[in-house]
Amino acid sequence: MTEQKPADKTYHNILNLVWEFLTVKEAKINFENQLEKLEEIIPDVNDYDFFGVVPALDACEALGELLHAIIAGETLEKAIQISQISLGTVCSLLETQEDRDLSETELKSREEIEEELDLQWQIYRLLKDCEKRDVDLILSLRNEIKQEGISNIGIKIEQ
């Protein structure tokens, strides 16, 4: 087993605090402080010469949007931005693999894009009918994601 890098550990700690906020009634978490911690680990793409920095940056941007949503209460707007970031990450991977820009038609026909959109719609359908915080549903969703163990671009997720 490999040791988790400090930035990875910080990222996962912040994400775990979000899950805690969603599932533990009256959890007291300083998300402004967590946002500051996240900002410290955002990679500078100019410091790297490999594709992996792009999805890492996207993941930090998405988590940052999530933290802003919690802080400001702008969940719908931020959820749309996070959805677009995630889809953009998949598009970037496909274009990097093809070593060219792909048209919208080409992207829409790719299995990876279909899978990403299917997953996003599945999550949306599960959550849209919730009138209040459904802790069991949230925990079930979290467990399903953890069990999958693979990111939207095929990277193994360390637990």
Model region roles, listed by residue range:
Residues 1-105, 109, 113:
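Structured binding/interaction patches within domain cores
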Residues 88-159:
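C-terminal auxiliary extensions adjacent to catalytic cores
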